[in-house]
Structures are given as C-alpha cells and as structure tokens.
Amino acid sequence: MKQQVFILQGDGPGLLVRRQQSAGLPVLYVHGATFPSALSVAYRFNGRSWMDDWNARGFDAWAFDFAGYGGSDRYSDDAQSEAIPGRAPQAAAQIARVVAHIVSLTGHSAIAMVAHSWGTMAAGLYAALHPERVARLCLFGPIAQRDERTEIGPSPQRWRLVTVAQQRARFIEDVPQEHPHVLIEPDLGMWGQAYLGTDSEAAHRDPPAVKIPYGPVADIADAWSGSLPWRPQDIRAPTLIVRGEWDGVTTDRDAAWLLSRLGHPVRRDAKISKGTHLMHLEHSCEGLFQAVREFLKEERP
C-alpha cells in the first residue's frame, strides 16, 4: 500500500509524518520510548504492517516520529542545558501539531489515537487537553501511576544509547523460560539493522547504538513515584486499554488503576494471550490488531 512520508515543519522541530490514505476515520499511532514509527506501526513482517491492517479496514492511517527519533529533527546537544529532552509535555505539543495538520487536511474534526508504552503518557496528556480532537483512544501497554519511589540516579542524563542486543533482551525478558520465542523475527536480524539505520551515528559507536532522548525514562520514573503527567479522569473519549498476558510493564494492577479512573463510561481492558509489552513485533500481534480495530470500528455512543 502506498505510503506518503514528509517532514512537518512549523513551530518546533521538523517531524517525520507517515500517511496511508483512505477516506475513513484518521487513526494516529504514537510510538514509545525507544524506537520510531518505521520500526513499529509501519514495520512490515511478511509484507504487512499494522498501518496496512488499518488501511485495509478503511481507516486513514497516520504515524509520526517524535523529535529525537527516526526521521525527525534532533534536540540540541547542549551540554550546558539542565533540561532533559523529550519529556511528555514536549511530546504532547508535537502530537498537537500533527493532529492539527491531520484535521486541516482531512476535514475530520476528531481522530482516533493509538499510543504505545511511554507514548501513552504524551497521548493521554494531549487527549486531556484537547478532548474535542480525540474520538477514540487506545492505550497499548500504558504506563500507569504507582506509588513506589523510582530513582533515575542523582544526575539525570540527557540521552540514552540503546544497542540491538539491549532491545532484544528487553523484548524477550518477560516470556516464560519454558515457552518458545514469540518474536516474529527471533534474532532481530533485519529489524536490528533497520533500527541502527534510524541514527546516522549509530554505526560509529562501539558497540553500535541508537541515541535517544532521556525524557521518557524520567517520565516513567515520575509516574512510578506517584506523579503521572495526565489525569485519566480528564479523558472524554471511549478508551481501550490493551496489553499482553506477559507484559511486565503494564500489570493487572496498572490496568485496573487506569480503568477505574478513566473519564468516559466506555472503557475496556483487553489482555492478549501470550503477548508481552512489544506484541506488535510478536506472533500475538494478530490478537492486538483485532482488539484495536474492533474497538475503532464501534459506533460512538
């Protein structure tokens, strides 16, 4: 399916935006903390991506890269700055720019949003601030508020370096030892090379690694220390929480905390069998795709 890719310019960093056009409801994917749209919603296994699935169902599929990721502009590497780049308020402002473009271009007054992991924090903040722009909200592996002190160190960093080996270890750590692998591409051979390709400097590091903003780590630490940057009570759209059976980031308790506080009466929690926090890259992706598209297709109450 034909995909348009362009850089959205304006007030702020240039943002890479993807679109697979259809006349239906626009659906925007909001990626997580470590890899951009090309490696998530737009990545094709056996010739098919999640964006392709949305498009085939009649949805106008959109995605973008936050500043500091993929094809978008990088934050300034100012060693003198104490600000941690890539925090949720900055990310929510970038979502606002993308949604404004979608609304202007398509004529739809509101869109559906599917966000993953740390991206749910930025998406939740945006949806709380702009309820008129969000028709439906899907929180895939969301970060919930906890009341356990989580430290990120005495001197928070501005950047992280992430290797393919670290990504793979993270992807498989929640799978029970007695269970076969669940990744569609077990060794991440092609995915890993594509991941390193999202950072022009990655190959020059030893070991090769992708540089990403540290903001998401700080946001998650705050959330798990009792300070989520958005209030679920402020959400005014039907909301789906979707997570894997083996998701170590979004626990049953986390899902229950969010579900009990969401502000719209239509709120659901779907747990996908044999899936982890990264199930869009796993064999369980079909269950994820089905749960999300069925929710997106429902008539607004």
Each language-model region and where it sits:
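N-terminal cap/lid segment of alpha/beta-hydrolase-fold proteins
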Residues: 1-22
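Short, surface-exposed "cap/lid" segments of acyl-processing enzymes
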Residues: 25-63
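Glycine-rich "HGGG/HGxG" loop immediately N-terminal to the catalytic nucleophile
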Residues: 64-85, 277
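Conserved acidic catalytic loop of the alpha/beta-hydrolase fold
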Residues: 90-110
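Conserved hydrolase catalytic core segment
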Residues: 109-148
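Alpha/beta-hydrolase
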Residues: 148, 152-240
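Conserved alpha/beta-hydrolase "acid-adjacent" motif
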Residues: 248-254
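Catalytic histidine-centered segment of alpha/beta-hydrolase-like enzymes
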Residues: 275-286
